[in-house]
């Protein structure tokens, strides 16, 4: 088996968050409150060459957690990531 070629540096050019909510048939009641839907936050990162990668952010509780985490990504984390160069996952 041949070794993998070295990784090329990743240079994020754009970071976006997408909040989705899926209604559930029966609300889930816990000590944190009642959930009437299941939230999800998907993250899209595009590099300076146009390659795109997707990820997600855990956001089950509290109910407003999905919007809060999406806003944190776009206002705090994205400015720290965009335009920098990353040699690898470490």
Regions found by a protein language model. Give the residues of each.
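Metal- or metallocofactor-binding catalytic centers and their adjacent structured scaffolds
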Residues: 7, 46-90
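Structured beta-strand/loop patches that form or line metal/cofactor-binding pockets in enzymes
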Residues: 2-54, 58-62
């Amino acid at each position: 088996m041949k070794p993998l070629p070295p990784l090329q540096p990743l240079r994020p050019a754009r970071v976006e968050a997408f909040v989705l909510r899926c209604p559930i048939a029966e609300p889930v009641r816990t000590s944190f409150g009642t959930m009437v839907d299941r939230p999800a936050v998907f993250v899209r990162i595009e590099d300076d060459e146009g390659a795109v990668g997707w990820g997600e952010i855990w956001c089950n509780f509290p109910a407003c957690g999905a919007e809060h985490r999406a806003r944190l990504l776009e206002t705090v984390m994205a400015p720290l990531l965009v335009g920098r160069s990353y040699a690898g996952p470490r």
